[in-house]
């Protein structure tokens, strides 16, 4: 099942580098970096690559993204879109290298880059940070307003909502459209076949030869589209829950342990417990905790999962660099 209050008995899982969590999948997150503002010996700056069928979406490329992609077996040609939450360095300093690698490797398809429009000056500085032979495939998509629909993918809806951080910040929600599966055997038994089935799907109803109205809903099932959410630097806010609503996979910052809730509030970040509460309120299926402060050593990492699990009873992954996390299979 999904999230909910603590007390349920569901598996808790914790990630380690170079591993794969949740089995093989055509929809899979590769975690490139998991540190907070300061990288450590064990954790590099942010970077998250989501493979979603034919799409390859790179979120928040921090320093070292190019190199981590090499370790993960990813190339510039795999990137079809970039989504930047905000222009703090740990979420964007890898952008110049990624853009220049796209140009150098001759990527031929459009690579759309969504980012907060209020940070346009930083986008331009990063986009043209050094001398290189440029490319015209990189397409800027500045975001504005209280809700932004990010265009470009025909089979995927990407929504961006503002979060509460010290600079303009957006979180992202990817939604696969629901699909209608027609029950052909039942229609055949009713004498409805061929072009009539197409009309029924297109219009939602038809009138049969006897003058009886036939509703599509009575002869079909709906396959719910899957949802992925990416919520980076923010304090607790309603938009974090809206972005994560019914998500199959939520990637969320958990910079601090609950004992540092005061620091989290001061710098507009989340604690592990707060991340768990957001996941529970949103009904998430699998939760990935990341963006871990450099103040915590390896001996304290288990506490992140414990504190999130006090509120959320779904699967929990404490992300490590180069771990792969599958989007859970359809229910």
Task: Give, region by region, the residue ranges found by the protein language model.
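Intrinsically disordered, low-complexity regions enriched in glycine and serine
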Residues: 1-7
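Conserved beta-strand hairpin/beta-sheet module of binuclear metal-dependent hydrolase folds
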Residues: 25-72, 172-174, 220-231, 249
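Active-site-proximal loop/helix segment associated with metal-binding centers of metalloenzymes
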Residues: 40-41, 156-243, 249-251
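Active-site neighborhood of phospho(di)ester-bond hydrolases with catalytic His/Asp-centered motifs
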Residues: 59-62, 79-87, 116, 228-234, ...
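Active-site metal-binding motif and surrounding structural segment of the metallo-beta-lactamase
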Residues: 63-114, 139-144
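A gly/proline- and charged-residue-enriched helix-loop-helix capping module
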Residues: 118-130, 138-144
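Binuclear metal-ion centers of metallo-dependent hydrolases, dominated by the metallo-beta-lactamase
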Residues: 143-147, 237-331
């Amino acid at each position: 099942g999904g999230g909910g209050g603590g007390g349920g008995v569901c598996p808790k899982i914790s990630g380690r580098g170079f591993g794969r969590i949740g089995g093989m999948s055509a929809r899979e997150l590769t975690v490139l970096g998991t540190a907070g503002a300061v990288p450590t010996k064990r954790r590099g700056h942010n970077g998250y690559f989501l493979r979603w069928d034919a799409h390859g979406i790179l979120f928040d490329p921090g320093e070292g993204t190019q190199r981590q992609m090499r370790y993960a077996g990813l190339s510039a040609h795999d990137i079809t879109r970039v989504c930047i939450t905000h222009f703090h360095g740990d979420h964007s300093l890898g952008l110049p290298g990624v853009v220049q690698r796209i140009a150098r490797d001759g990527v031929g398809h459009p690579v759309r880059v969504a980012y907060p429009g209020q940070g346009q000056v930083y986008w331009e500085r990063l986009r043209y940070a050094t001398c290189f032979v440029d490319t015209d495939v990189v397409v800027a998509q500045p975001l504005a307003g209280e809700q932004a629909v990010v265009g470009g993918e025909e089979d995927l809806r990407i929504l961006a909502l503002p979060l509460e951080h010290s600079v303009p910040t957006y979180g992202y929600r990817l939604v696969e459209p629901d699909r209608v599966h027609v029950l052909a055997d039942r229609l055949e038994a009713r004498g409805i076949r061929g072009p009539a089935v197409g009309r029924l799907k297109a219009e939602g109803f038809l009138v049969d030869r006897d003058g009886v109205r036939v509703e599509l809903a009575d002869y079909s099932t709906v396959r719910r589209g899957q949802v992925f959410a990416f919520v980076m630097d923010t304090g607790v806010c309603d938009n974090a829950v809206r972005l994560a609503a019914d998500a199959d996979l939520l990637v969320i910052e958990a910079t601090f342990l609950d004992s540092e809730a005061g620091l989290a509030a001061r710098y507009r970040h989340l604690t592990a417990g707060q991340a768990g509460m957001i996941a529970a309120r949103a009904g998430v299926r699998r939760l990935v905790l990341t963006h871990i402060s450099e103040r915590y050593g390896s001996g304290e990492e288990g506490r992140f999962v414990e504190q999130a699990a006090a509120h959320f009873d779904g699967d929990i992954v404490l992300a490590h660099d180069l771990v792969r996390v599958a989007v859970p299979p359809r229910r």
